[in-house]
């Protein structure tokens, strides 16, 4: 409950006792007349007591004589007799103050002791029975809780003499036990000053719960005397501490020694006792005092200077010197959406919050105090929530002490943006500090704290200071951004508010900019950024990320979430932009490519147009113009710059940036260029030749031999290059290298791969390493040979090692260096472990070489101990007799006749547990129910989970996960985790229905879900009872036989409410009769039954759903996963069947065409669904096609089977040479949907992109005979559309447009591992025949080539296609026609990119001699006529005097009004961080009338036309956009 409400309640209850220093007592009546002689009970306390939770009170009971029969009762139950409590009474809650007053005038007589007590009316004093005057049995109630409320009775035996008290405990709103850590003790001072016993609890708060304390009964003098003790007779004030603790100002009287009188408003101060006592206690601990005399002065436009004085020292802290200070500062946001000139009126006073009472409020008179209490705006803790709505955006401002949070919520997308304004701090040991990187013309709150070894002081007095206004030093630095905005077609209304960078926008303009003009930012941002990158400054000023696009001049649109930062950060953005004009250079100008080779580029540029004198260096960014290529960054470049190491015949894009000491420019115009192709064939059969620094190929001869590892091709000619060795080995010795390196003659015999290095040649180890290694990287082999880490530099660059330390590794070096020269097998690749069971696992790998005689398979334990070594002649092996739930690792080594190759990398796996039954999982939580419901918050609870499903007790902590879902507005479950058996769901939508269930988790084992309840988020709305499902007969194993008669009963506890009960089991649904609390279904078990679901609901829509799973002993059945499996040559195939049914250990086998299948191997796995059997065939051939049967034989001899057809195809080529991407382009697919067609690009999800308008085209281009239905199933393609994924027949009536992108993506994936493309196509023509040759990398993978050709310039002619497995082919063509030719490589995985070439027609056609001279004459005549005509047209075009019909078709290259097209620089923004833009469809020249058609060919949505009048600012056109003349 909120303290404010409690304060009003408490004030009402105590109104009769306030206003003066007198109190009125209610007498406590007895049921008998009090005589002067008989025993009777008396009290000074009232009969009705209202006391405060957490404090103590007393119930006085005094007997006018002595008796052992005085008994205390609570609510009729006895709790004590005499001065002793009963055993059932908690002494922590009660205490009896027992005292006896002896009447010595009557004297003493007789003797007494423990065994001989005195009689009634007497008390044993010094072993004598003395007459009693009175005996007190006062009951003290300690640490009051609500359980102590009730009726108390003090009674004399069983007589009618009694006292009754009614005790009412009020909620205090204070945290329990808050007083326990308060250490001060003013008990002696309080006793000396005569403070009332009812008030002495505040003199020593640590015992406040032990003694009677009633702050409402304390008088003015009590508080005066107590505060005199707490403030050392008024010499110390605690008011400042109370301010920092946010104690209301009308309670400051209790923080100083200047207490005047008790007022009605002081009643509210009860709820601030923890803060007040903490401040009183803090003064006597060695904390430092806060710094004083805080002075804050503005420096420049973005700094504040803060200075202070050292805090005063006291007796308590003089032994603890100040260690350092912390300066805290926070921006006071000016939020225009709230209206007003100053925006949000925050924290205008010292430590005050929105709505807090001002300091002078607590000084008013008694009559006015009541009005203060009634004012709803001055709650004890202040009003901390402010909500408002503007332009459809809800804004909520939440403040808690020193942090302010502004939240905007978009009702359309149901999303929020949060902005927090919290204090930042700077630590220092000085008494002055300068705060930098602040916002100009902005108010800040500043305070300082001091720290010593004991702790930190309270904050000092807060200061509010403003930074200075930012003034531009040089107006010449401001660009003409208004003209730029006008040229960019920004509306004049928005341009006047956004493009004038010389001044910050006003509050009213800010609201317009954030709402009406927000759509103009893509045009305005590049204009005001002016080629500079202001992002670093904006980040320092705390600009929110949604508005950082403005700082970088981005053309991205700002979403609705930017409304918040536009209102809060716009002034800081304009401040950074103005600073950048003075300190940041613009981008380099006139970037040009001056020289190109196959492997290098020369780039030149000029100085920036702005702030060129500030430039310190330039940075070059270059990358291939392909998706996903890495960016090469070259710093400190100087114009002209030569960049080497580029790939030949490749397209690149580069850009430059300028850097100054204070910032950087935006990227320059992106330059697109292509390196030259290599012009000197032949290329190396493997790898690339050696190139010189200038990009030219290195020429080798006898004088300039190739280095080790390379051979000189074409020796004796001018086309001799250094190419890598093509395979097996180059030599068995390296003596020539040793001679060149001046190896001593005594060590020359070691320069062979079958020799090692002797000890006498240790000092020549590095020479031997460099020659033997041939400069190749042998690190993998060295790691396998376990070469020590310091000595691994012999296996890679720089090929030098310390001789003394690494000489012992020579034998390992020799093994690795000689491996490349002995034709040993390569390391086995792609080792995979599959079909893992509790005692077996299958190991498979790639068989890449044909000369392997055997594979060695080694199995290791987790610690590395070798367990088994097996040999396999195939590329697969299965280990059996393994231990369950154990870690293993395996590696494979290939062996041929020359020896064994290096071992593969280890593959690790873990066998499955011996028992796959899920009995080790905890049971599902039960009795999920509502504890309380307040509407937006609901507390749900459940019974704890203590056992697992196998009845074992859980041994580890249980973590519960609660799931809840808004049934009307959400499809996403929200989760909460807890280790308790309850949780509070917060921020629920009022009056909404929610589904709720809970699961339990022990380690990584999760239970099934509990029953599902429906909660109505409505105050005091209880949940529905949980239904109970009982199934008879109750089989312990939970397994029922088909046809067995079962009875399923769903019932509810006895409640007085009509509820609907629906019991669903398979296809059976039964409902309860009106008023009945149960429903029964009697039926026979069948295979359709797997779950019994009982749902209880009421008229409000709430539900409680319970489920119970049924397991049926199914009839034996076997099904194939696919009826038809299409497989291509050299692929692998997996035929999968699933067996369900009774019986143990069924025998499963596969047959092919009626006979036992011989090629392949079987993988068998047992699951909850049954047995899954897979017949795996690697590298399928033609003879493997046919019908396969999965045959299952049970223990009783019954046999079931299912069949599937394997269809073999070698046709993997398309009908024309166009690839998928080309097909999509031809079909007109554009935008993001085109990415689905591109191999290597991230495929788009149909959930994120709407490509249904291209569905027909996508499905057409995705047509493929390959079977990729597994991928389609995983991508969510429905079964009716799966034929499109396997090349089967398909009904045109079925709509599969929603799956078009997924089907295309799967088709693309099947091509990603296709063969690489051919290279170096060579064409030789002779007498009507053309011989075509090409190069292809050496590989042992199966492949063939397809050659397409047709006549050039005839798009209507069909392509001719030929296939071959050789790297050449001969074509019959017409020698008088030009032909275009395309060649690709293909295998089972797909085909490569097409390599195009051309066949020119015969340049010397055979014609008759009689016609030759005549033809030549007419050719000359025609050429002369055309020459004269062309010259005339050229002259007229220069004079602009061409007739309209002719001029229309002649482009004027120098026309300044010629339309240009701008496209986005891919390198813009963060270097290379922008999205790529593909440019296709550039047409010829066009007039204004055809401009729209030309622009429609562009695929980017952000294209902008270059202004025809912006001739004076063309340099700025190169920042974000490049320009193409069309």
From Swiss-Prot:
Residues 24-33 have a biased composition (Low complexity). Residues 20-1415 are extracellular. Residues 39-170, 1116-1207 form the Ig-like C2-type domain. Disulfide bonds join 61-154, 1137-1190. Residues 1-19 form the signal peptide. One of its GO terms (cellular component) is M band. PROSITE patterns: FN3, IG_LIKE. Its main location: membrane. It is a single-pass type I membrane protein. Residues 682-724 form the WR1 domain. Residues 379-470, 587-678, 827-914, 924-1020, 1314-1406 form the Fibronectin type-III domain. Keywords: Cell membrane, Disulfide bond, Glycoprotein, Immunoglobulin domain, Membrane, Repeat, Signal, Transmembrane, Transmembrane helix. It is found in: Cell membrane. This is Ig-like and fibronectin type-III domain-containing protein 2. It comes from Caenorhabditis elegans.
């Amino acid at each position: 409950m909120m303290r404010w409400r409690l304060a009003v309640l408490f004030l009402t209850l105590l109104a009769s006792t306030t206003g003066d220093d007198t109190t009125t007592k209610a007498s406590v009546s007895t049921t008998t007349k009090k005589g002067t002689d008989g025993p009777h009970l008396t009290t000074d306390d009232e009969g009705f007591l209202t006391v405060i939770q957490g404090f103590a009170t007393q119930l006085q009971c005094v007997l006018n004589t002595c008796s052992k029969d005085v008994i205390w009762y609570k609510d009729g139950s006895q709790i004590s007799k005499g001065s002793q409590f009963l055993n059932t009474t908690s002494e922590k809650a009660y205490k009896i103050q027992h005292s006896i007053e002896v009447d010595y005038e009557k004297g003493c007589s007789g003797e007494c002791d423990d065994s001989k007590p005195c009689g009634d009316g007497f008390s044993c004093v010094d072993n004598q029975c003395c007459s009693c005057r009175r005996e007190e049995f006062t009951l003290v109630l300690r640490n009051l809780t609500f359980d102590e409320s009730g009726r108390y009775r003090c009674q004399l035996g069983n007589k009618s003499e009694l006292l009754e008290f009614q005790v009412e405990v009020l909620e205090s709103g204070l945290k329990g036990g808050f007083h326990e850590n308060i250490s001060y003790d003013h008990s002696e001072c309080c006793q000396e000053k005569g403070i009332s016993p009812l008030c002495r609890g505040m003199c020593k708060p640590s015992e406040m719960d032990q003694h009677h304390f009633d702050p409402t009964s304390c008088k003015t003098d009590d508080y005066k005397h107590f505060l005199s003790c707490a403030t050392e007779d008024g010499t110390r004030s605690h008011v400042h501490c109370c301010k920092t603790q946010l104690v209301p100002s009308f309670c400051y009287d209790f923080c100083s020694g200047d207490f005047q009188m008790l007022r009605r408003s002081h009643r509210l101060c009860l709820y601030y006792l923890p803060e007040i006592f903490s401040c009183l206690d803090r003064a006597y601990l060695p904390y430092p005092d806060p710094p004083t005399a805080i002075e804050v002065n503005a420096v420049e436009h973005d700094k504040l200077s803060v200075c202070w004085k050292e805090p005063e020292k006291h007796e308590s802290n003089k032994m603890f010197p100040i260690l350092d200070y912390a300066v805290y500062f926070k921006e006071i946001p000016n939020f225009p959406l709230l209206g007003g000139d100053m925006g949000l009126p925050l924290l205008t006073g010292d430590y005050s919050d929105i709505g807090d009472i001002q300091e002078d409020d607590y000084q008013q008179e008694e009559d006015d105090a009541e009005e203060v209490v009634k004012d709803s705006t001055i709650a004890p803790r202040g009003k901390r929530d402010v909500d408002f709505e503007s332009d459809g955006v809800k804004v909520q401002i939440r403040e808690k002490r020193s942090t302010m949070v502004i939240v905007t919520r978009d009702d359309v997308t149901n999303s929020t943006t949060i902005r927090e304004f919290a204090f930042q701090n700077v630590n220092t040991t000085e008494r002055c500090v300068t705060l930098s990187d602040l916002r100009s013309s902005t108010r800040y709150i500043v305070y300082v704290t001091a720290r010593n070894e004991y702790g930190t002081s309270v904050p000092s007095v807060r200061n509010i200071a403003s930074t200075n206004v930012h003034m531009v030093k040089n107006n010449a630095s401001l660009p003409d951004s208004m003209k730029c905005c006008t040229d960019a077609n920004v509306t004049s209304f928005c341009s006047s508010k956004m493009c004038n960078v010389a001044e910050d926008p006003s509050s009213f303009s800010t609201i317009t900019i954030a709402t009406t003009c927000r759509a103009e930012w893509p045009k305005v941002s590049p204009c005001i950024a002016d080629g500079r990158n202001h992002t670093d400054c904006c980040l320092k000023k705390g600009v929110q990320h949604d508005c950082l696009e403005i700082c970088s001049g981005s053309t991205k649109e700002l979403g609705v979430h930017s409304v918040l930062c536009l209102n809060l950060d716009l002034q800081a953005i304009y401040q950074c932009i103005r600073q950048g004009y003075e300190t940041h250079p613009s981008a380099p100008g006139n970037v040009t490519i001056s020289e190109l080779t196959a492997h290098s580029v020369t780039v030149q540029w000029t100085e920036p147009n702005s702030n060129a004198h500030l430039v310190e260096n330039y940075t070059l960014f270059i990358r291939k113009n392909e998706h996903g290529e890495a960016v090469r960054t070259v710093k400190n470049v100087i114009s002209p710059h030569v960049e080497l190491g580029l790939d030949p015949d490749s397209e690149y894009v580069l850009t430059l940036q300028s850097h100054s000491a204070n910032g950087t420019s935006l990227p320059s115009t992106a330059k697109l260029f292509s390196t030259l192709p290599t012009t000197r064939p032949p290329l190396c059969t493997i790898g690339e030749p050696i190139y010189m620094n200038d990009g030219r190929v290195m020429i080798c001869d006898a004088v300039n031999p190739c280095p080790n590892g390379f051979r000189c091709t074409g020796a004796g000619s001018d086309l001799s290059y250094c190419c890598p060795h093509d395979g097996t080995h180059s030599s068995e010795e390296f003596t020539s290298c040793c001679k060149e390196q001046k190896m001593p003659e005594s060590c020359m015999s070691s320069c062979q791969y079958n020799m090692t290095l002797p000890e006498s040649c240790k000092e020549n180890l590095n020479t031997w390493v460099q020659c033997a290694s041939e400069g190749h990287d042998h690190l993998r082999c060295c790691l396998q040979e376990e070469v020590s880490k310091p000595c691994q530099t012999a296996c890679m660059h720089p090929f030098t090692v310390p001789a003394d330390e690494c000489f012992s590794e020579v034998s390992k070096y020799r093994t690795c260096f000689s491996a490349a020269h002995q034709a040993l097998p390569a390391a086995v690749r792609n080792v995979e472990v599959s079909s893992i069971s509790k005692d077996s696992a299958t190991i498979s790998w790639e068989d890449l070489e044909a000369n392997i005689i055997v594979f060695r398979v080694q199995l290791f334990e987790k610690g590395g101990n070798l367990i088994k070594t097996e040999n396999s002649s195939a590329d697969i092996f299965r280990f059996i007799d393994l231990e369950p739930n154990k870690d293993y690792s395996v590696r494979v080594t290939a062996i041929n006749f020359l020896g064994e190759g290096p071992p593969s990398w280890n593959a690790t796996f873990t066998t499955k547990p011996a028992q796959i039954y899920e009995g080790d999982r905890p049971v599902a939580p039960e009795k999920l129910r509502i504890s309380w419901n307040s509407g937006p918050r609901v507390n749900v609870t459940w019974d704890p989970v203590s056992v697992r499903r196998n009845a074992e007790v859980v041994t580890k902590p249980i973590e519960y996960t609660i799931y809840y879902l808004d049934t009307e507005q959400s499809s996403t479950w929200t989760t909460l985790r807890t280790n308790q058996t309850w949780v509070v769901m917060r921020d629920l939508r009022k009056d909404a229905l929610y589904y709720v269930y809970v699961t339990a988790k022990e380690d990584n084992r999760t239970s099934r879900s509990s029953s599902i309840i429906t909660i109505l988020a409505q105050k005091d709305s209880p949940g529905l009872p949980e239904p109970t499902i009982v199934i008879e007969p109750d089989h312990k194993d939970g397994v029922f036989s088909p046809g067995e008669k079962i009875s399923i009963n769903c019932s509810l506890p006895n409640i007085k409410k009509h509820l609907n009960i629906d019991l669903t089991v398979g296809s059976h649904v039964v409902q309860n009769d009106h008023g009945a609390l149960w429903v029964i279904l009697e039926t026979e078990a069948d295979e359709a039954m797997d779950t019994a679901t009982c749902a209880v609901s009421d008229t409000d829509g709430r539900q409680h759903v319970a489920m119970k799973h049924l397991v049926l002993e199914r009839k034996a059945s076997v099904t194939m996963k696919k009826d038809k499996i299409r497989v291509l040559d050299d692929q692998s195939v997996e035929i999968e069947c699933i067996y369900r049914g009774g019986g143990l250990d069924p025998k499963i086998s596969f047959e092919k065409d009626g006979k036992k299948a011989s090629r392949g191997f079987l993988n068998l796995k047992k699951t909850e669904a049954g047995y899954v059997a897979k017949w795996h065939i690697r590298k399928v051939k033609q003879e493997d096609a046919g019908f396969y049967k999965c045959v299952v034989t049970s223990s009783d001899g019954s046999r079931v089977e299912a069949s599937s057809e394997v269809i073999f195809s070698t046709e993997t080529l398309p009908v024309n040479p166009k690839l998928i991407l080309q097909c999509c382009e031809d079909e007109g697919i554009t935008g993001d949907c085109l990415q689905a067609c591109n191999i290597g690009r991230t495929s788009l999800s149909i959930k994120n992109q709407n490509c249904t308008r291209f569905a027909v085209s996508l499905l057409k281009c995705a047509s493929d005979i390959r079977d990729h239905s597994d991928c389609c199933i995983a991508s969510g393609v429905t079964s009716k559309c799966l034929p499109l994924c396997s090349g089967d027949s398909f009904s045109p009536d079925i709509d599969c447009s929603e799956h078009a992108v997924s089907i295309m993506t799967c088709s693309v994936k099947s091509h990603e591992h296709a063969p690489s493309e051919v290279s170096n196509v060579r064409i030789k023509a002779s007498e009507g025949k053309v011989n075509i040759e090409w190069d292809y990398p050496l590989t042992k993978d199966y492949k063939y080539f397809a050659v397409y050709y047709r006549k050039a310039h005839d798009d209507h002619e069909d392509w001719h296609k030929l296939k071959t497995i050789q790297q050449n082919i001969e074509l019959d063509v017409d020698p008088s026609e030009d032909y275009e030719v395309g060649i690709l490589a293909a295998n089972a995985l797909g085909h490569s990119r097409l390599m195009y070439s051309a066949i020119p027609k015969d340049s010397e056609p055979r014609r008759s001699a009689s016609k030759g001279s005549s033809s030549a004459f007419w050719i000359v005549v025609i050429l002369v006529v055309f020459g004269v005509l062309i010259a005339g047209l050229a002259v007229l075009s220069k004079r602009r005097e061409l007739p309209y019909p002719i001029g229309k078709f002649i482009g004027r290259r120098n026309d300044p009004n010629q339309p240009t097209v701008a496209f986005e620089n891919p390198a813009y923004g963060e270097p290379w961080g922008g999205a790529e833009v593909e440019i296709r469809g550039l047409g010829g020249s066009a007039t204004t009338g055809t401009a729209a058609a030309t622009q429609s060919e562009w695929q980017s949505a952000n294209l902008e036309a270059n202004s025809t009048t912006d001739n004076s600012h063309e340099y700025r056109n190169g920042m974000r956009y490049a320009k193409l003349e069309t």
